[in-house]
Swiss-Prot record:
Keywords recorded for this protein, A-Z: Amino-acid biosynthesis, ATP-binding, Cytoplasm, Kinase, Nucleotide-binding, Threonine biosynthesis, Transferase
Gene Ontology terms: biological process: threonine biosynthetic process
InterPro entries, per database record: GHMP_kinase_C_dom, GHMP_kinase_C_sf, GHMP_kinase_N_dom, GHMP_knse_ATP-bd_CS, Homoserine_kinase, Ribosomal_Su5_D2-typ_SF, Ribsml_uS5_D2-typ_fold_subgr
Coiled coil residues, start to end: none
Catalyzed reaction equations: L-homoserine + ATP = O-phospho-L-homoserine + ADP + H(+)
Name of the encoding gene: thrB
The protein, known as: Homoserine kinase
Phylogenetic classification of the source organism: Bacteria, Pseudomonadati, Acidobacteriota, Terriglobia, Bryobacterales
């Protein structure tokens, strides 16, 4: 194989958005990955393996490829055909940023093969435009925990928080899916000033707590009135899960739009996740717990 047609290796982390009160603004990277190998090819070839591979199209409809085509079209360029091998670890339809990881991968692939020379923040901006909100694609791109917003000019602004290791986390994944569109459809068109102030206070408190490792403000820091109360009817057991209290448990929140649950806990208290599993079980659903790191880096691209 010539060096000019060697494989690129791309790894994009999963993500958990909102973190309770930070609706469409806060997200963290998870050490569960979408990995891809790609290179130039005479014709398009896509294969998919790994978790939920049956839900990943091995065809031109694939989200990674469609994203790359969109980027090329927006730049008035033509995306060359590629050989793309996908290996997925991220549960699909569970609120762990599987689509954001695919979008990010598509932007990175287009950036590399079209020689756009984009830096990570430009890649983030493009991915956020395509996703419609930055809270998942920001940690996919930058890693760690990220606060992000889209400014009045439509440009994504993001700040990555270095993480003091003061807590651990896990994702409890139930055995049912919840489409993001369905989870967004139940949200109100507006909020009272009281609820807005409630969420602003807690989002600010949460950012400060995460940045400094001040865990004694949990679980108050992850309380929310913007989205979780409205989604309780879509996630059996969510009402009880959000109110769980136990030694070592810092608090629970929906992971993104759900149905998975993000569990913050003190080191050595992994067993608190069993309480969440039990609530799902009492509501007729099996679940599994994924103990996740928070990677310091977002996507990683190397060449063989």
């Amino acid at each position: 194989m010539s060096a000019s047609n060697s494989w690129f290796h791309l790894k994009v982390p999963a993500s958990s958005a909102n973190l309770g009160p930070g609706f469409d603004a806060l997200g963290l990277a998870l050490g569960v990955y979408l990995t891809c190998r790609f290179r130039h090819s005479a014709t398009l070839s896509i294969t998919a393996a790994g978790r939920d591979a049956c839900g990943i199209p091995a065809s031109p409809d694939n989200l990674i490829w469609q994203t790359a085509l969109t980027v090329a079209r927006n730049q008035r360029m033509t995306m060359p055909p590629i050989e793309l091998e996908i290996h997925n670890e991220i549960p699909l339809g569970k609120g762990m940023g599987s689509s954001a990881a695919a979008l990010t991968a598509g932007v990175v692939i287009a950036d590399e093969l079209l020689d756009l020379g984009w830096k990570p923040l430009r890649i983030l901006d493009e991915a956020a435009r395509l996703e419609g909100h930055p809270d998942n694609v920001a940690p996919c791109t930058l890693g760690s925990i990220v606060a992000s917003a889209i400014d009045s000019g439509g440009v994504t602004r993001a700040v990555r928080l270095p993480l003091p290791k003061s807590f651990d986390l896990a994702i409890v994944v139930p055995d049912f899916d919840l489409p993001t569109a369905k989870a967004r459809a139940v949200l109100p068109s507006g909020y009272s000033r009281e609820d807005a102030v409630f969420n602003v206070q807690r989002a600010a408190l949460l950012i400060a707590a995460l940045a400094t490792g001040t865990t004694n403000v949990f679980p108050a820091a992850i309380e929310d009135r913007f989205h979780q109360p409205y989604r309780e009817a879509l996630v059996p057991g969510l009402h009880e899960i959000l109110r769980l209290r136990a030694p070592g448990l810092l608090g629970c929140a929906l992971s993104g739009a759900g149905p998975s649950i993000l569990v913050f806990f003190e080191r050595g208290y992994e067993s608190v996740c069993e309480l969440v599993e039990q609530i799902f079980r009492l509501n007729g659903h099996a679940s599994e717990t994924l103990h996740c790191s928070i990677p310091e880096r977002g996507f990683e691209l190397t060449r063989a």
